[in-house]
Amino acid sequence: DEARARARRERAAKATSSSDERATRAAIEACRLRAISHLCMDFERVAGPHLGKRWCSAFEEWLASASEDEPLVPAGDGGGDALAKKLRAKKLRAKKDASDEAVDAVVRVMMLKATECARVMRNEFRGPATSVSKEERADGVVSLRVGKTEVRLNGDHFEKLKTLYANASSKEFVENDFLFDAFAMVCRYDAAAGGQFRFSGGSQASLHGQVFDVLRDCFKVECELFASPLNCRWPMYYSKYGDVDKPFGSLGDFRACKPSGGAFEANPPFDEDVVARMAEHLFECLDAASSALTFVVVTPHWPNRPCWEKMRRSKFCSRAEVISVREHGYYEGAQHRKKSRYRLATSDTSVLFLQNESAVESNPVTDEKISLLREAFRAKRDAKK
C-alpha cells in the first residue's frame, strides 16, 4: 500500500512539473510575441524604406537568423551579418548606395532594437501562466488567451492540432495541457510571421493538398522536412521549432533526418543560406543511404544562384522542372488564421528530384508523373496575391 501511495505521489509530482513547464513555456511565448510585434514596427520604420514592398519577407528571414538559444530574437552577431547581407543585396539590385556606411547605419539601429526586444522579453516574464482560456466564435475562429495575449486560428486548424496532439502522446488527452501547448506553438509561429503588427507568413507557405497527393501516389513521399504543426500534410514531419512543435508530433529540425532510404518532400524557407545548408545535408544523406532514397525539393527557380545551381548540377539531380509563376499557387503561410487559404505564386518555382541510383531505378520520374504534378500545382480560383 505504501509503495502504491508513493508511486501515486511521484506520478502527481511529475504531472505537476510537466504542467508547470507548459505554463512557463506559454508565458514565455506570449512575451516573445508581444516583443516581436514591436520589433516589426521598428523594422518597417527603419529598414522598410531600404527594402521596398517585400520588407516583410526580409523581416521574417532576419528573425530566422536568430540562435536556437533565443528563437526569433536576432540580437547576436549573426543577426547583424544576416541583415547587412539582405540590405546590401537589395541596394545593389536597385542600384542604390550599398556602401558599408549606408548599410551599417540601418544595421546598427536594428541591432539595438533587437537587443531591446530581448531585454523586454526578460523583464515582462513574471513566471508560469496561471490559466489559458478558449473561446469559439460564431465565425468559426477559435481564440486562445493567456493574460493579455490572444492568438486566433481557424476551427479546422484547431481540430487538426487536437488530432496531432493526441496521436503524438501515449498519455491520456488532457484539455488544459493541450491548450497551453497549442497557445505556445501558435504564438511562436505568429511571431515568426511578423508578430501581430503585420502578419505575413511567406516563409511558411506550403504546397496544395493535391500536390502532396501526387507526391505520395507517384513518388512514395510521406514525410516533409520543412513543415509545422499548422501546415503539415502528414503526421510524419520535421519542423524548425522542436521545443514547441514536439507535442504535436514533430520529429525535430530537418538536420535530424538521416534516412537510410525512403522519399521526402523539402520545401524550405526561400532563403539562400537555408537552402545551401539543406542541400549539403541532403547530399550527405544520399551518399550514406543504403537503399533507394528520394528528395523532392521545391524552391524558387534561382538560376545563377550558387545554392540552386549546386543542386541542379549535382550527380543526384535526376530531373529539374520549372513551373511558371502564372501556372501555380500555394497555401498561405498564415493559413491558420486567414479567410482564404490560397495565394498566387510570386515567382517561378523549381521542383528538383534528388535521387541515388537505386531510387532512379525503383522510383523513376516520368513525363506522366510530372504532368500530374504540374496540374496539382495550379492556382485555385480564389487565390490572392
Q: Where in the sequence are the language-model features?
A:
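Class I S-adenosyl-L-methionine
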Residues: 1-266, 270-385
